[in-house]
Amino acid sequence: MPLLWKRGFLLVICWIIVRSSPTPGSEGHSSVADCPSCALTTLSKDVPSSQPEMVEAVKKHILNMLHLRDRPNITQPVPKAALLNATKKLHVGKVGDDGYVEIEDDVGRRAEMNEVVEQTSEIITFAESGTPKKTLHFEISKEGSELSVVEHAEVWLFLKVSKANRSRTKVTIRLFQQQRQPKGNSEAAEDMEDMGLKGERSETLISEKAVDARKSTWHIFPISSSVQRLLDQGQSSLDVRIACDLCQETGASLVLLGKKKKKEDDGEGKEKDGGELTGEEEKEQSHRPFLMMLARHSEDRQHRRRERGLECDGKVNICCKKQFFVSFKDIGWSDWIIAPTGYHANYCEEECPSHIAGTSGSSLSFHSTVINHYRMRGHSPFANLKSCCVPTKLRPMSMLYYDDGQNIIKKDIQNMIVEECGCS
């Protein structure tokens, strides 16, 4: 029923546009006035500023799909060592030979196989120091709190073992979630005072694991149910106390926070960076604790098999797909978008002589964004035009980026890249 409604709505819109378009006998009528996709070609030739306008439309479209008003302001990015280590260890991406992060685009491959793809976000939140000592603070991104189901959530901790340690002794690492202490519970308040929390917070064991203390390595602690409860309560701050009773005896220690880069005085009373990190400091930064969360909400999608559309190669004058790539580095966005390196903002152009065939309203998302952007700018090629050559197949796009809170987010965005074009 929703699909039929969308088709009906599209036909009504097309009918209104056709009724408002100039008649075939109108003076100055041309093939350009028959279809906005034809006007795209004309615009690129007649309007010198068309490419900058297209780029601006693409930027607005990406921000809209990521539910952002403006691009995040990155003042203190996560150290590259920590970023590369986190993405290397998780399935959100891999590090290429050149040191850049490449997204593992599983969602795109699934879309090619016509599988139902659910909108998901994979979020990496690096720990901040908490109170009291040995407490980690995670500020979960708003992106994660808006999604309904936590597929899994894990805290990653690095256990560093002294080279002199030859013991086979295992140590038990425990994670306690700290929460505000309810009023009126005097007995619990006394217990908190014994733990040095002054009765302000209670804590609950949320994960524990016995690990081998013979080698330095990462350890994963699942806390999915705890994060789900936290989000269900409308909260986004997670405080976790880390306990390891036998670590000191076995010569092992948990890297709870990477060492910060030292500051130096520049002689004028201002601080400046104190040079490059040492090898040990670089290693500490790469072992910074983090929380990895995969969250989702289902979105019904229906797929239909279609014949592959035409590519615009300069030799065809019927409805086809025009390739248009926007490099994030060229537009100054590479500081907050980790991967991919750019966006294939393909669109549809050329003439469409065939009759109207209904398509899903969601399929028009990007095409309509570009057309409306030009129409609002008052470019004459788009005045009183009827839509005809439109996307008939789109695929998702995976993005890895920083939000304003310096969290790393991997988001699979539906209907982002035009794959095929056809006549509506």
UniProtKB/Swiss-Prot annotation:
Keyword tags: Disulfide bond, Glycoprotein, Growth factor, Hormone, Secreted, Signal
Segments traversing the membrane: none
Residue numbers spanned by region Disordered: 178-200, 260-288
Tissue specificity statement from the Swiss-Prot or TrEMBL entry: Ciliary ganglion neurons. Levels are higher in the choroid than the iris.
Regions annotated as coiled coil: none
Subunit comment: Dimeric, linked by one or more disulfide bonds. Inhibin A is a dimer of alpha and beta-A. Inhibin B is a dimer of alpha and beta-B. Activin A is a homodimer of beta-A. Activin B is a homodimer of beta-B. Activin AB is a dimer of beta-A and beta-B.
Record PANTHER family: INHIBIN BETA A CHAIN, TGF-BETA FAMILY
Protein name: Inhibin beta A chain
The organism of origin for this protein: Gallus gallus (Chicken)
